[in-house]
Structures are given as structure tokens and as C-alpha cells.
Amino acid sequence: MQWLSVCSLLVLLSVLSRSQAQNQICTIFTEAKEDGFKSLILVGLAQNLPDSTLGDLVPLIAEALAMGVKCCSDTPPEDCERDVADLFQSAVCSSETLVEKNDLKMCCEKTAAERTHCFVDHKAKIPRDLSLKAELPAADQCEDFKKDHKAFVGRFIFKFSKSNPMLPPHVVLAIAKGYGEVLTTCCGEAEAQTCFDTKKATFQHAVMKRVAELRSLCIVHKKYGDRVVKAKKLVQYSQKMPQASFQEMGGMVDKIVATVAPCCSGDMVTCMKERKTLVDEVCADESVLSRAAGLSACCKEDAVHRGSCVEAMKPDPKPDGLSEHYDIHADIAAVCQTFTKTPDVAMGKLVYEISVRHPESSQQVILRFAKEAEQALLQCCDMEDHAECVKTALAGSDIDKKITDETDYYKKMCAAEAAVSDDSFEKSMMVYYTRIMPQASFDQLHMVSETVHDVLHACCKDEQGHFVLPCAEEKLTDAIDATCDDYDPSSINPHIAHCCNQSYSMRRHCILAIQPDTEFTPPELDASSFHMGPELCTKDSKDLLLSGKKLLYGVVRHKTTITEDHLKTISTKYHTMKEKCCAAEDQAACFTEEAPKLVSESAELVKV
């Protein structure tokens, strides 16, 4: 029974507060209810034992459920009160089969903190796979789903948890819930496959977005530390809950930041403990709940889904009497007094006051202004005439204008995206990014151009444009964070390396300021650089787009300052060749003859 009690404790105690009494399995068993209880256990097991089968885990989960009942009895077993991490690791290490099957021998030779670190590190090395591969057509999935809904969702949780061992359990369960909702909707439709294909694509995008946000936060924490994470979260939640005071928001954000390090390290026991403490304390504050409608609604969710609800909630209405604009100069004496004694408190108050007034702003715009304001306060607050000094220092910096200018920029990008086909816009992004970093591989630039297109396509759907700025800049910044972390920026070029090492809020602006790289020495532009044959006659739009992007990549790398007119000429010649050869009786022979001509003509154009 020790192993089974550990299975329960692994995840169930992981959502408990240290300040609560012992034997809290009973509390969570009651809060999460039976299905939530079993789901949490399944996530914890699958993430830590990726080479075990679902069949290996099912009987353990069933007995762990029985253990949960026993922990609610009048005489709970002693294992209900033992340390969860040590229990879990000891139980795993005592099973030779589990150790061998999951390659944990090295970890089990360690003890205490070293063993915990080894288990976390072992989990971190498991390959991630965010795709939601459909092994069966919609009709078969629907049949299985209708036959046994719980078993179907359980299989999804198992597979997704194994493929994503670093995702917090509450995120995995939110994703599983969403996938179940897709099937619930589509399995009642006459055209289930069409419905499934459409909704699955949307759902997959939402999954990628959520995971990108989590990963970006971890990257920011690793590179910039708690201070920047706290600033980001202060903006985010002040925008969502403008009715909360600065003091209330500050306390909440401190607790949020405390969860980041353990959650990003893969230490899900501590992660979920901290998250549970955070959500319980926030949801117990009746004063805040009475003023924050969105938070109040989320706190009515079950224990498993409350945290995800809070992260996804929309901004509440602003409080009555809140001025439209925040004027730092109106109370500069008090600002400087606070800044001199506790600069972080003063900067936090500034960020809060701007954020509650501007839910339409991105975090980055507010943080860019805050950085300028901080420099002004550093320069001026010790001076006798600090008020005039701050006015002079911030003369060219207006937060409202910054928000308007950035919003207008993205609206123009949206107009450009709407004016052309999806393929044309993605190709234009390929050209733009190849100009500034021709050293990058095709795969890298293909991903970047695809990401920019996907971000704008999603964010530009806000017809009024009220929230296009936070949507687009947040997602593009997440993409920059991932790119700078995935690749060695110095291997691309010094300009990209410089931007990746800029302050968090300035990275995107820095990249936009990069000019075409004229120092890059390109490879020879010849027919061997491109493979253009009968495969271009496919009707698969993705393959055609890929081929067109490869041609543009090769040409622009050869001359990063090539004109748009010359690119249009090459593109026209490419389509003419494609139409001619796809209509030819012997397509291969036609491409063999025409493709080298196109490359040769393109080479001549880039010399101009």
C-alpha cells in the first residue's frame, strides 16, 4: 500500500498549503471530487513515469482512490502525513521494474535534495510534443467517446501528460477538458469529421498559445529574474482587476511570483502547493471578491480549474471615479519621496496606476514607459527642483501617445495582412526576416514568418481593434523569447544577439530597428540551391507555400537589399514556369529545362 499511498500523495498533497493541517488528502478528495482526484493522480504518474503504460497505471489509480477514502476515515493511515516528494521517490526507487522501465537508476542512487533535483532533471529531458495527433477518424473517436466518456478523456490525459511532462497538472487538465468539449460538440453533428477538423485546429492553436505563454514566462524568469516577472504580472492582473487596490494587488502578485520558480523547474509538488495556497488565499478575501466580478466567478470553479479560470478572465469594469489618465507629475513630491526610500514600491505604484486605466495596452508598452520614468526619477528625485527636472526628462514620453502609436502600428499590420492572401503575407514576412538575419536557416525563418502570420491572423479578428495591441505584442514577444532561447543568437548575427540581450520590453523594438544585413556573404545562387520539379504541380497549398518561401529565402539571402520590384519579377517568372510545366506532357523534363533558367535569371537580377 505504500506505493499506492504515494501515488495519491504525489499529486494530491501537491496541491496543499504548508500552512494547512496534516492529512489533507481528504480535503482534496472532497474538493476535487472523484473524477478530478483520479485525473490529478493520472497526470502526476504519467509525467514522472513516461515509459510506463496506461495499463501499468490504471490499477494503481484505482487503489489510490481507495487510499483517498481511507484518508477521510476516522483512522487515516500514517502515510497520509508523510512528506510527498520523499515518499514518491522512495516508492519508485523500491520498485526495480519501475526504475528500469523509466531509466531512474542514477536518480535512485542519490538521496534527499540531490534525488529530488535528479527526478526533476530527468523529467525535464523527456521530449515535448504539443501536437494533438488523431490516431482515429472522427467517427471512430466519437464512438469511443460516446461509449465511455471518462475512459476516453483518461487516455487523452495519459498521452498528453507523457508528451508534456513539464506542464503544470492544472494546465494539462484544462487542455483535456477543452478537447472533451470539442468532441461533445462535434459528435452531435452530421458532418462530425468536418466539425472536428475545424474545431481541432482552433483548439490546437489555443493549446500552443497557452503553452507559449507559460514557456515565455519561464524564459523571462530565467533571464531577467523575479523583478521583471513581478512587473509583468502586476500589469496583467491590474488590468484584469482594476477594482483591487495597489496594496491588494501587490500582495497577490508577490504570491504569484513565488509560484514561478518551482513551476518552471518542473518541481510540480512545490508548484502546486504554492498555486493552491495562492488561489485559496485570493478566493478567501471577501473584500476583493466583492469588487472583482471575474475573480469571484472563477473562485466558484472547482479546485482543479480555478487557477486556469483566473489566468483567462477578462478585465473587469474600471471603478467609478477613476480618472482617464494617470499624471505622474501631479503628485511628484510624494512619488519622489517613496522612490528615494523604496524605489520598487514607487515603480510598482506607477505601473499599477497606468495598468488599471489602460487594459487596451500591452504589458511591454507600459514597461517601456516605466523604464523611462524610472530613469527620470533616478536622475531627478535627489534634486531640489525635482518636479521640473522630471517634466523635462519625460517631455518626449507620454504613455497615452505610446499606446495610441503602438495600436496604430498593429492596425496597419492588420490592414496589410487583410489586403493580401495568407500566403502572400507570410511570404512578405519571410522576405523581411531574411533581409535582417540571412545567416539563419530556412527552417528558423520559416517558423518565424509562420508565427508572425499566425499571431496577426488571430489578433486582427478584434474588429474594433481595442485589444489588438496586448494580443499581438504579447504573442510576438513570446515568440521572440522562444527564438532567443532556442538558438544561440550570436550564431545568427551580432544585431540579433544584441537585441536578444536587450531589456525585456525593448527586444521587439530593437529587432524592428535592424536594417538589412549587407555584410553577409551568401552561397552561390545556382540551380543546385533549389529543387523545383513536378511536386510543384500538387494542389496542396502548404507544399506550394513552402516551395515559394524557399525560393524567396535563397534569392533574398543572395542580396538582402533586393528591391520589391525585382522580387515581383522573380515571383512572376516562378508562377509562369510552374503553370507551363504543370501543363506539359512531360512535367519532369520541363522543370529540368526551365528551373535552371529561372535560377539564372534570378541571379542576374540580384546583381543589379
Swiss-Prot record:
Location within or outside the cell: Secreted
Family of this protein: Belongs to the ALB/AFP/VDB family.
Database matches in Pfam families: Serum_albumin
Organism per entry: Salmo salar (Atlantic salmon)
Superkingdom classification of source: Eukaryota
Top-level taxonomy: Eukaryota, Metazoa, Chordata, Craniata, Vertebrata
Tissue: Plasma.
Official protein name in the record: Albumin 1
Residue ranges of every copy of the Albumin domain listed in the record: 19-205, 206-398, 402-600
MF term (GO), any: metal ion binding
